[in-house]
């Protein structure tokens, strides 16, 4: 398997619950390394740009409002098969459908306030990492 990088957001609901460390520990315990991390408050423009692919969908306004409702942690994770591994750790988008022991099953409130975001492909990971991090901000460990 190849070493990959993936992008992760710990969303406002999880930051508000003070579970940043618990979520990051799950990534690390699964063999993923944090190679870049920022705690930040997204502006409306940043959230709209990041989620532009959903701009025509009915939930777009609510998504932007939620993602700007409090600070988030944006991270780059690195490891073997990082994209699939992160998605497995996160669990299903709807926490009611997420397997026990996944991040969303344990920390998410709803399908909207679902604790984390993770890239779903190599192309998405590259785009999402570049959206929030300059190449010089991502390290190798």
UniProtKB/Swiss-Prot annotation:
SUPFAM superfamilies cross-referenced by the UniProt entry: Nucleoside diphosphate kinase, NDK
GO cellular component term, pick one: cytoplasm
An example molecular function term from Gene Ontology annotations: nucleoside diphosphate kinase activity
Pfam families: NDK
Chief place where the protein resides: cytoplasm
BP-aspect Gene Ontology terms: CTP biosynthetic process; GTP biosynthetic process; UTP biosynthetic process
Localization in the cell: Cytoplasm
Catalytic activity reported: a 2'-deoxyribonucleoside 5'-diphosphate + ATP = a 2'-deoxyribonucleoside 5'-triphosphate + ADP; a ribonucleoside 5'-diphosphate + ATP = a ribonucleoside 5'-triphosphate + ADP
Cofactor(s) the protein needs: Mg(2+)
PROSITE patterns listed in its UniProt record: NDPK (PS00469), NDPK_LIKE (PS51374)
Record carries keyword Transcription: no
Active site per the UniProt annotation: 117 (pros-phosphohistidine intermediate)
UniProt xrefs under CDD domains: NDPk_I
EC number: 2.7.4.6
InterPro entries: NDK-like_dom, NDK-like_dom_sf, Nucleoside_diP_kinase, Nucleoside_diP_kinase_AS
Keyword annotations from UniProtKB, A to Z: ATP-binding, Cytoplasm, Kinase, Magnesium, Metal-binding, Nucleotide metabolism, Nucleotide-binding, Phosphoprotein, Transferase
Residues that bind ATP: 11, 59, 87, 93, 104, 114
Superkingdom, natural source: Bacteria
Family from the record: Belongs to the NDK family.
Family matches, as PANTHER family: NUCLEOSIDE DIPHOSPHATE KINASE (PTHR46161), NUCLEOSIDE DIPHOSPHATE KINASE DDB_G0292928-RELATED (PTHR46161:SF3)
Description of how the protein assembles with itself and partners: Homotetramer.
General function of this protein: Major role in the synthesis of nucleoside triphosphates other than ATP. The ATP gamma phosphate is transferred to the NDP beta phosphate via a ping-pong mechanism, using a phosphorylated active-site intermediate.
Name this polypeptide is given: Nucleoside diphosphate kinase
Native source organism of the sequence: Pseudomonas fluorescens (strain Pf0-1)
């Amino acid at each position: 398997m190849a070493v990959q990088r993936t992008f992760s957001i710990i969303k406002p609901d999880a930051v508000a619950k003070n579970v940043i460390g618990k979520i990051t520990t799950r990534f690390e315990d699964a063999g993923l390394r944090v190679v870049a991390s920022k705690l930040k408050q997204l502006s409306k423009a940043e959230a709209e740009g990041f989620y532009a692919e959903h701009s025509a969908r009915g939930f777009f306004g609510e998504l932007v409002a939620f993602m700007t409702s409090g600070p988030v942690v944006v991270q780059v994770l690195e490891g073997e098969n990082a994209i699939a591994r992160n998605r497995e750790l996160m669990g299903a988008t709807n926490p009611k459908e997420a397997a026990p022991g996944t991040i969303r099953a344990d920390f998410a409130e709803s399908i909207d306030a679902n604790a984390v975001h993770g890239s779903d492909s190599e192309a998405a990971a590259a785009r999402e990492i570049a959206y929030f991090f300059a190449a010089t901000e991502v390290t190798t460990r």
